Amino acid sequence: MTNPMMSVSSLLTSGQQKVPMVPSPFGPPIVDRDVLSSSIAPTDPSQFCVPSQFGSSGLPNANMPNPLSSHFYSGWGILPPEPIKAVTTRNEMFERHHAARAEMEMYSLYQQRRMERVNPKGLSGLGIPLFYGSSCLGGPTGFQGRSTLPASDVHLHRSTFRHLQGNPILLATRPHFTECWGQKYRLRRGAVYQKPPESDTESFKSQAEEKSSSQMPTLSYEEEEYIKDPDIEVDNQQKPRVADGKPTTVPANPHGELHTHQRKPSSLEANAWDDGKGKPSEQVYEGCDGKNGVFRPVSILPLSGTHEQVALRENCSLSDIQKWTVDDVYNFIRSLPGCSDYAQVFKDHAIDGETLPLLTEQHLRGTMGLKLGPALKIQSQVSQHVGNMFCKKLPSLPTHARQAFDQPADTSPLLDMSSWSDGLSIPGPQDLLSPKRTEQDVMRN
């Protein structure tokens, strides 16, 4: 009986095809010499060897290269062997496909994480219907260029629109977000709120005319709205009005009221550190009054009441901090309480007005050897000086922005987006002042 481990299975003969036998896993594979061509198989039977399926086998003759191990896969099959180059090309194509797919998944994950970082409550925490239109690029990448709802089918409440401006996620997407909302403000609100949007647009026009002419300070805002707004006048005809010949008790102009509110704290703070001199306080707030803009100046907290510090503030607040010399910085550091010992360090490092705002806490404590308290004092005073100069250099704001700065809001003025767009693209103050007007009507009745 023939041992099956030593049996030879011939795949093809000269004129007859046979079914190949399964090789035994306990021994080396054996291939008939008739299968291979004369160019591949050596004529000498002692030099014939087939690479093992468990690894590359060495040839008995070292001078004879192994053609099967480099050009063909080891093993048997009916199909012709496939070159390794084609296999590697196909594998590279598969790897590129999987890498691109993984990259797309990682990008979508990154977008989601970034949106969650801006707004931890998610997109539902906004409380408004989000639009992924061409003008508002705030939505995910897959939804850009689409609108979830047509503009005519949106029901938007005034309170929602009021909180829209200071929203941080909308602030991060695009600065002109309220521009597109101001153009789409004529929306359907149901049967009750059909006329207020038109009256709001008329109040926008009245504000624009008031800003351009600036010759109507005697009329109160309430009377102006009643004149410009026939719809609201019709609605309020049910309530008797007594203000025919008597002057109203409402302030003459909210913007005038803003100027008075604005000058009061400046005069109070000026009395705190002018020590009988009227010039320093007037010059400090000269650039921040109603003429140059309504920015409320960042008040410099007086750390000591010495005359030297007052004189230094008089010079430093009027000049640009970037124009300071090394001696100016030396005098500035020496005037701060508790920092006079480190003034020479600033002079040794040649710190002038351009490099002073660039110093960080690491520079002050690590490089220059300051303690934590003086370093924080210096950083606070420098940032306040830079903030004052920023307020002086910015142009004047429109009327509605002044009112937005004067009103106590939940969001800080830095998040107010009303200064980025025109007067006609901002919700009118009628929405913001409607509860105040109703209270005044009740008091008048």
Swiss-Prot record:
Record's keyword terms, sorted: Cytoplasm, Nucleus, Repressor, Transcription, Transcription regulation
Q: Which Pfam families match?
A: SAM_1
Q: What is its main location?
A: nucleus
Q: Tissue range of expression?
A: Expressed in the retina and the pineal gland. In the retina, it is predominantly expressed in the outer nuclear layer and developing rod photoreceptors.
Deletion: any effect? Answer: Samd7 knockout mice show decreased expression of multiple rod genes in the retina, ectopic expression of nonrod genes including S-opsin in rod photoreceptor cells and impaired rod photoreceptor sensitivity. Show an up-regulation and down-regulation of cone and rod genes, respectively in the retina. Double Samd7 and Samd11 knockout mice show shortened and disorganized photoreceptor outer segments, reduced light sensitivity and delayed signal transmission from rods to rod bipolar cells at low flash luminescence.
Residue ranges, annotated region (Disordered):
193-282, 425-445
One annotated GO molecular function is: DNA-binding transcription repressor activity, RNA polymerase II-specific
UniProt-listed InterPro entries: PcG_chromatin_remod_factors, SAM, SAM/pointed_sf
Q: Which residues form the SAM domain?
A: 324-378
Tell me the CDD domains matching this sequence.
SAM_Samd7_11
Enumerate the Gene Ontology biological process terms.
negative regulation of gene expression; negative regulation of gene expression, epigenetic; retinal rod cell development
List the SMART domains hit by this protein, alphabetically. Answer: SAM
What segment(s) does the record annotate as region Required for localization to nuclear polycomb bodies?
Answer: 98-172
Q: Where is the composition biased (Basic and acidic residues)?
A: 227-244, 434-445
- Where does this one sit in the cell? Nucleus; Cytoplasm
Q: How does it assemble?
A: Monomer, homodimer and homooligomer. Component of a Polycomb group (PcG) multiprotein PRC1-like complex. Interacts with PHC2 and NR2E3. Interacts with RNF1 in a PHC2-dependent manner. Interacts with SAMD11.
The entry's function note states: Component of a Polycomb group (PcG) multiprotein PRC1-like complex, essential for establishing rod photoreceptor cell identity and function by silencing nonrod gene expression in developing rod photoreceptor cells. Via its association with the PRC1-like complex, promotes epigenetic repressive marks H3K27me3 and H2AK119ub marks in nonrod genes, silencing their transcription. Represses Crx-controlled photoreceptor-specific gene expression.
Q: How is this protein named in the record?
A: Sterile alpha motif domain-containing protein 7
Source organism: Mus musculus
